[in-house]
Amino acid sequence: MARKKGTSTRKKQKKLSFDYGVVHIKSTFNNTIITLTDKDGNTLTWASGGTVGFEGTRKGTPYAAQLAADKVAREALRMGIKRVDVLVKGPGPGREPAIRTLQGAGLEINQIKDVTPIPFNGCRPKKRRRV
């Protein structure tokens, strides 16, 4: 069946309205992924070093994390979110610049929590690197 003339194929975007969100920052040495969720954990928007235009080793830089955080913060403010909790995971260099950018963009940060997984004597670690 052919599509009628004058109709669009784009979906209608739902008008989302929240006042509170959770920002998850996963910072590795290769990339930083920033996800904005509602309080139930449903993803609203996300950005990473790759989605803001960096490739390869530059995705892991603090500047890439800063731009990704700015993109998420602008989207959050557009949705009406003003207050956020920040959950940080991982040891990468993008942790602090991302938090500073979220705060500088106008989001009110309630709490910052480090949720980096630490094993309680779990799996045997990889052998030590010899250079």
Swiss-Prot record:
InterPro entries referenced in this protein's UniProt entry, alphabetically: Ribosomal_uS11 (IPR001971), Ribosomal_uS11_bac-type (IPR019981), Ribosomal_uS11_CS (IPR018102), Ribosomal_uS11_sf (IPR036967)
GO biological process: translation
GO molecular function term, any single one: rRNA binding
Pfam (any one): Ribosomal_S11
A Gene Ontology cellular-component term: ribonucleoprotein complex
SUPFAM superfamilies given in the database record: Translational machinery components
Keywords noted in UniProt: Ribonucleoprotein, Ribosomal protein, RNA-binding, rRNA-binding
Family: Belongs to the universal ribosomal protein uS11 family.
Subunit structure of this chain's protein: Part of the 30S ribosomal subunit. Interacts with proteins S7 and S18. Binds to IF-3.
Primary role: Located on the platform of the 30S subunit, it bridges several disparate RNA helices of the 16S rRNA. Forms part of the Shine-Dalgarno cleft in the 70S ribosome.
Name of this protein: Small ribosomal subunit protein uS11
Protein's organism: Thermotoga neapolitana (strain ATCC 49049 / DSM 4359 / NBRC 107923 / NS-E)
